[in-house]
Amino acid sequence: LMISRYSRKELVSIWSEENKYKIWLDVEIAAAEAMEKYKIIPKGVASLVKKKGKIKVKRIHDIEAKVKHDVIAFLTSITEQAGLKARYLHQGMTSSDVLDTTLNIQLVQSGNILLRDIDKILSVLKKQAKKYKLTPCIGRSHGIHAEPITFGLKLASFYEEFKRNKLRLKDAIENVSTCAISGAVGTFANINPKVETYVAKKLKMKAEPISTQIIPRDRHAHYFAILGIIAGSVERVATEIRHLQ
């Protein structure tokens, strides 16, 4: 749950219920397109759902309150709008195929915003480091005045740290850019592996090499560990600025 006064509009939008369900729909439509291509379901399902399926958050919640299952509630809502042909959606899939693929897409979307932020930070730090390269200030050891340095050197240090952060974040985004459309235990028992390949390409992701019911969580742990490192860098800059006062 995001606290509104501390949240950015772009990120609130990415993690909103409406965007989550929109991505669910994108995943289901992509899977349906693949199933049509490989003659698993009748032609026209994907185009029908794309045309008539709308995200109705309140209706999904109302259905979920009765059926106690989020994906069933979502699919029921879409079927109400698109008609019985929509019953072919989700064939051979498991809920986590949709949930985990969507989570990773949201992480990629958020990460790309943070990458743009880092680029802005780098631009400012580079400019200011050059501007103040000869401006003297005190260096500190254990927080105590030590020997003179320049303010530009301090900013250059921040610049190099955020260069490393950019590389780390790009790697984390790449690492979490996987999807899984592999069924209840990841064995493709009731779904053609070609469906997963199609969905991955359609959504600009990579197929998870080996999944179980879920996408392995070490990918997410790595992503959030990198966010923690970046947060530490931001804190370092803030503390250094405070010490200048």
Segments predicted by a language model, with ranges:
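Glycine-rich anion/phosphate-binding loop at the beta-strand->alpha-helix junction
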Residues: 165, 213-245
